[in-house]
Every structure is written in C-alpha cells, then in structure tokens.
C-alpha cells in the first residue's frame, strides 16, 4: 500500500 495508513501520513 502506498501512503495508505501505515506510513501514509495520518499522524
């Protein structure tokens, strides 16, 4: 996943 939830940028 690209920019999903893990290393995406939500936090």
Curated annotation (Swiss-Prot):
It catalyses: Random endo-hydrolysis of N-acetyl-beta-D-glucosaminide (1->4)-beta-linkages in chitin and chitodextrins. GO terms for molecular function: chitin binding; endochitinase activity. It is an enzyme of class 3 (hydrolase). Signal peptide: none annotated. Keywords: Allergen, Carbohydrate metabolism, Chitin degradation, Chitin-binding, Glycosidase, Hydrolase, Plant defense, Polysaccharide degradation. Its EC number is 3.2.1.14. It comes from the Eukaryota. The keyword Cell cycle does not apply. GO terms for biological process: chitin catabolic process; defense response; polysaccharide catabolic process. Belongs to the glycosyl hydrolase 19 family. Chitinase class I subfamily. Hydrolyzes chitin and may play a role in defense against fungal pathogens containing chitin. This is Endochitinase. It comes from Triplochiton scleroxylon (African obeche tree).
């Amino acid at each position: 996943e690209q920019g999903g939830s893990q290393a995406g940028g939500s936090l």
